[in-house]
Amino acid sequence: SWHAAGMVGQLRTSNSLTKINKYSVELYKNISKKTKLSIGWNQCGSLILGATDQRMIQLQRTAAMAKVFGVNAELIDSEKCLEKWPVMSNEGITGGVWLPDDGKVEPEKLAQCLAKCAKDNGVKIFEGISVDKILIKENLVYGVQTNQGEIKSEWTIICGGMWARQLGMDIGVDIPLYPVEHHYVISETVKGVTANLPCVREPDEMIYFRSEDDGGIRLGGFQKISKPWKVNRIPKDFSFKLLDPDWDYFKQPLQSGKRRIPQLQDCQFQKFVNGPESFTPDNNFIMGMPPGCKGLFVLAGFNSVGIASAGGAGKYASEWLD
């Protein structure tokens, strides 16, 4: 989504999911050469921190799995973690996994670049238009009804993110995802922070952070108890909007971030982003053809890894339908 954090990691829990993200990285590295549009790609690498013995066992498995999946990864100690991100504190950190080929992008620029590539290859993109319903007859989907008329097609792909569930519900197709508030903050310039610092994830605290081009820090996180938003139906007028900041709900990730990066203690935050995103029960995205329905394909519910998976998911979905 346009308000995503823009972190692009390759390693996932299976070879097939990792293959999807690896293709995304290759695409993002080269797409600007074709379009002459910058997407802000920066192969800064990523770092996963471990703060417990149990986490380090899991990270050892992660490093071994990366090797099997063809992803460059190195298990490093606490001091080397600090070398990768000198501004943070390594207190309580036992070690981590360093993934040098990961990176970050600017989501809005990436979307514009992908759209240009699509148009250059004959795709028509209609903006300022809404899909009122999916057209179906005798279990065969043959297009969509929009507020500007019908669009008929051999295949209809639901890739509407958090809107996907309600589109499916209207024709009896269950797409198990729902909107959840997802928060991150962007700090003012922090001394010592540069654009080339790696993206960092600390799963024990459920936080992530990355540097900004202007020397700020983007800090986000997840909660054990999520905050759903408009589960039944999303308002028709909600588009390219953010929700109100919720500092109380973000208290735990913010405190964890300030402990890890002490300079944030006395720092002002210039932006609070509260953007709803789609999440699924098993934390895996939905990709495939719903049973009992022809001509329909679903690609949605990316659980905050939409930017990292978009390139590969689009590639393999198109090959599936070819």
Which role does the model predict for each range below?
Residues 42-46, 180-181, 272:
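Short Gly/Ser/Thr- and Asp/Glu-enriched loop/turn motifs at secondary-structure junctions
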Residues 107, 204, 244-322:
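C-terminal catalytic lobe of FAD-dependent flavoproteins
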Residues 9-11, 15, 134-245, 252-265:
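Flavin-dependent oxidoreductases
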Residues 1-2:
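Glycine-rich FAD pyrophosphate-binding loop
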Residues 6-84, 206-209, 214-216, 244:
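Dinucleotide-binding Rossmann-like beta1-alpha1 core, especially the glycine-rich loop
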Residues 74-77, 125-127, 146, 158, ...:
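General beta-strand structural signal in soluble alpha/beta enzymes
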Residues 30, 42, 51-127, 132-140, ...:
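Flavin (FAD/FMN) cofactor-binding and adjacent substrate-gating region
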Residues 31-40, 69-72, 122-124, 169, ...:
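Surface-exposed helix-capping loop/turn segments at secondary-structure junctions
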